[in-house]
Each structure stands twice: as structure tokens, then as C-alpha cells.
Amino acid sequence: MLEVSIIPFEEKYAKQFYNLNVEWLEKYFYVEPYDQKVLSSPKTYIIDKGGFIFFATYNNEIVGTVALINQQQFYELSKMAVSPKYHGLKIGQKLIDYCIQFGKEKKWDSITLYSNRKLVPAINLYKKVGFVGSTPILGSAVP
């Protein structure tokens, strides 16, 4: 069985970041103008502002992504998407686990995320890895 690897952002992966996120947004919500801007220029809107983007690879293919966005007072786990044909391989959990470990290594106090209550499988995953609910956000201390 092939392993899932987590790799950092490189400009050559910007299109996959866009495609994975747009696919997810179109399935559950819609792509807002601000989303379009951020997803089209992730280096400008995330990396250059002190954030991080990671990708999950499986069988030498980019199959998932996640961003840690610098919100000045905290880091926000955001823009997480996994290609539907790779659901069930726990790639989302691997991306989140990687981000939590990354935050620990950086000695961050916490990572925050925002989610929609209708995304029940995602909410369950967030709780499973230690995020705690509040209204309207889920947040987690980095243990």
C-alpha cells in the first residue's frame, strides 16, 4: 500500500490548491469573489502573509490540501480539501494531524478553525482530533 506524504507549498502546486478547493466549495456552498482571489493567488494571500500551505500526496499525485492562515493573533486552519476519489483514506485526518504537530513545533498556543454545522463528517473529525466546539467556531489548543 502506498503512503500518504505531506509536503509544503511550492508555486508549481498552486493550480491543485485552486482546483481542490473550488471542487469542494462548489459541492457544498459556492465560490465567493474573495475565495476566487485567495485561491487564485495563494502565495500572495497566504504564504507572503506568514501562512503555510501543505499538500497530501498519494501515488505521486496531489490529493489534498490545507492552509494555516496567519490571522495575527492566531493561526486558522482553513482551505482543507481532499479529492472525492480519495475520501476514506483518512487523508483529511493526516493533514490536520500534520498541522497540529506543525503548530506544536512552532510553539503556537492554539489553532482555530471555522466550519459550517452542516458538514457533520468534518465536525466529527475536528472533534476526534481535539478541536472543541463553540458558537460559531471550533477551536483547539495545541497540546
Predicted segments, located by residue:
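Conserved GNAT acetyl-CoA-binding A-motif
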Residues: 103-115
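Acetyl-CoA-dependent GNAT
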Residues: 4, 8-79, 83-85, 96-98, ...
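Conserved glycine-rich acetyl-CoA-binding loop
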Residues: 61, 80-97, 106, 117-124, ...
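Conserved catalytic-core motifs of GNAT/GCN5-like acyltransferases
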Residues: 112-117, 123, 127-143
